[in-house]
Curated annotation (Swiss-Prot):
This protein's record includes keyword Chloroplast: no
Keyword terms: Cytoplasm, Glycosyltransferase, Transferase
Pfam family for this entry, one: UDPGT
Species per Swiss-Prot/TrEMBL record: Antirrhinum majus (Garden snapdragon)
Function: Glycosyltransferase involved in the biosynthesis of aurones, plant flavonoids that provide yellow coloration to flowers.
GO molecular function: chalcone 4'-O-glucosyltransferase activity; hexosyltransferase activity; UDP-glucosyltransferase activity
Tissue expression: Expressed in petals. Not detected in stems and leaves.
SUPFAM superfamilies, alphabetized: UDP-Glycosyltransferase/glycogen phosphorylase (SSF53756)
Name the UniProt record assigns to this protein: Chalcone 4'-O-glucosyltransferase
């Protein structure tokens, strides 16, 4: 006989550098509890295979980068207007390479499932034509999944563009949400991005299942609405919360970061941490407002202020700000180890862009939040954080701009007020639930077992 097939070989296909880390966390979560399963991550991310392999550092997980493809001129000219279109189009242009990769893998392994990020919706056509069971990976929460699955209903019932609706939207398992808080990609029905999301939502219903980065206790109402068919027929759901199951990074690197040494000198729960993701850059005017608000709040702070490499941070901030706040503040424009910062005893609050991974990390370490959404699905995440689970305070902003007075007010409210204490109490409760979900007998591990059974039966 020829070379024996491995018992199970799961393929994870992801699109962008931003979502690659979530795919790696999912792969590690699966192999940690099912070491006999081999996983290959196929990605269009612009990363060297050797570098990604170092990050993965797991013999059961193989990384395979697809060869870059030339982008059509009409797409490259549109990148700055709507970068999300690129997230969908690159995987679509890679379909031929994906098919080749799957055929190559199938010669040595028994492919049991293909897990695709929603940006890789175009891969659904390839996998179904090859009779490979296909699962969608939603790196956001169940709230976001509800929004996707409700998109066809909005498409049929809303006349014109959602951008012009200016009204409340009712969705099962949701608090009442304003149309302006829906993801901007759903705003204009004639755009390619709108059509991509609509097609993705329809394919999700036809898939073998949907993996969601959340846990039952966190999004019980949304989970019940989905399970009870309030969003129409859906495939099996697997709520895994795999990113919170991922352990801290190795201490070799992070111990060298000076912000952690600075935190060691601060009182317990006294520091407000401001971090807005890899794309969270602000205008010079907004940076000054943040600085003024922090200084007037009187609170200790650790602030990651992202700027272009050629810019001088000191010149962008109010004159004398860094020297006046030297004893109570730490400002940097380079990478900081977010998990290690959030887990530090000195950190008592987190001003966040409401990216889902950041929200889960904050909850897992019991850190209350102030929500400042910037892009993608972050506005709907803020509604969930503030209205549904009550673990954050909102920042009032107009067209994304936050005044110094508003920031000062919310920081004081979180760190000093009775309302802030209530948010902290709720976060402390969910910290326990977060840990329980990924512990023995927890809901996420139970969901993982159901998923493994579905692909190995």
């Amino acid at each position: 006989m020829g070379e024996e097939y491995k018992k199970t070989h799961t393929i994870v296909f992801h699109t962008s550098e931003e979502h690659l880390n979530s795919s790696i966390a999912l792969a590690k979560f699966i192999t940690k509890h099912h070491s006999s399963i081999s996983i290959t991550i196929i990605s269009t991310a612009p990363a060297e295979s050797s570098e990604v392999a170092k990050i993965i550092n797991n013999p059961s997980i193989t990384y395979r980068g697809l060869t870059a493809v030339a982008l059509p001129e009409n797409l490259t000219s549109n990148i700055n207007k709507n970068p999300v279109e690129l997230f969908f189009e690159i995987p679509r242009l890679q379909n031929a390479n994906l098919r080749e990769a799957l055929l190559d893998i199938s010669r040595k392994s028994d492919i049991k499932a293909l897990i695709i990020d929603f940006f890789c919706n175009a891969a659904f056509e390839v996998s179904t034509s090859m009779n490979i069971p296909t699962y969608f990976d939603v790196s956001g929460g169940a709230f976001l999944l509800c929004t996707f699955l409700h998109h066809p209903t909005l498409h049929q019932t809303v006349r014109g563009d959602i951008a012009d609706l200016n009204d409340s939207v009712e969705m099962p398992g949701f608090p009442l949400i304003h149309s302006s808080d829906l993801p901007m990609s759903l705003f204009y029905r004639k755009t390619n991005v709108y059509k991509h999301f609509l097609d993705t939502s329809l394919n999700m219903r036809k898939s073998s299942g949907i993996l969601v980065n959340t846990f039952v206790a966190l999004e019980f109402r949304a989970k019940e609405a989905l399970s009870n068919g309030l969003y129409g027929p859906t495939p099996p759901l697997y709520l895994l919360s795999h990113t919170i199951a991922e352990p801290h990074d190795t201490k070799v690197l992070v111990n060298q970061h000076e912000c952690l040494s600075w935190l060691d000198l601060q009182p317990s729960k006294s520091v407000i941490f401001l971090c807005f993701g890899r794309r969270g850059a602000f205008s010079a005017q907004q940076l000054k407002e943040i600085a003024i608000g922090l200084e007037k709040s009187g609170c200790r702070f650790l602030w990651l202020a992202r700027i272009s490499p050629e810019m001088d941070l000191n010149a962008l901030l109010p004159e004398g700000f860094l020297s006046r706040t030297k004893g109570v503040g730490f400002v940097t424009n380079t990478w900081v180890p977010q998990k290690e910062v959030l887990s530090h005893d000195a950190v008592g609050g987190f001003v966040t862009h409401c990216g889902w991974s950041s929200v889960l990390e904050a909850l897992s370490f019991g850190v209350p939040m102030i929500g400042w959404p910037l892009y993608a699905e972050q506005r709907i995440n803020r509604v969930f954080m503030v209205e549904e689970i009550k673990v954050a305070l909102p920042l009032d902003e107009e067209d994304g701009f936050v005044t110094a007075m508003e920031l000062e007010k919310r920081v004081r409210e979180l760190m000093e007020s009775v309302k802030g204490k209530e948010v902290k109490r709720r976060v402390a409760e969910l910290k326990i639930s977060t840990k329980a979900a990924v512990s023995k007998g927890g809901s996420s591990l139970a969901s993982l077992e159901k998923f493994i059974n579905s692909v190995t039966r």
